[in-house]
Amino acid sequence: MGKGFSFASVILSYFLVGGGMFTATLVGSELQIGTELAAYALFAAGAFAGGFVAARASRGQTILEPAIGAVAVVATIVGLAATTPIGKLIWVVAQDQTIAFVGSVGLTGVVGALVGASVSERLLGEATQSSIPWIVYTAMAAFGASLLSTLFASILFLGDNAATRSGLDIGAVVLIGMGGGCLIAGLAVGASSRVRPLLAAFLGGGLGVTGFFTLVTRATPPATSDAVTGVALLAGAGAMVTLIGTVFGGVTVGRKQAT
């Protein structure tokens, strides 16, 4: 077991489990999996992967934080759906089916994250003292945080009449989501890590942003041939923002928890 409950690890687990579940959904879409059972299995697999990694990154109770993170992810999905016109329409037209779907997704997410965290703890024990694995942890956290932050930013700036009020286009919203996601992910990494994974945070942040923008460009293919250069520049910017967040999180929270 770890050294007590860690709220920073809950935030990190939230991004890791969320990133795992959304990645599993994208994989299912690419594979054109149409059965309901297979979709739930993918949700569980994504939550398992997120919970497994979250347990390795947690400095606290290990199993508790990924479970709370999974619940928060499900709450986010419900909240985002409830704020969109299509989500409100689905709720009115098929309330019973919606409740059943949300319950099933919530159950598979929480169980998957719990099983992943339990397996991780039993096989590998407490959180690692090495900074090398934090490249993977930070990459997954930056990816998940960028994705979730962009969803929030889309609702805030593009939902309903917000687009005319904010004057922002989808590109600006994606950049806001990426920047905010990398900063929050870095803060969570710095606060949760038992080491000072500065280089790992820089590399992981860049990898996470690369994965995020690869996803974005697949959804909306760029019109120019400079996409690779653009993604590289954005990955470098994301890496720097993640590093800044990691330094600040380590100084303000991580160092206090270590003493």
Predicted regions and their residues:
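Juxtamembrane/disordered regions of integral membrane proteins
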Residues: 1-259
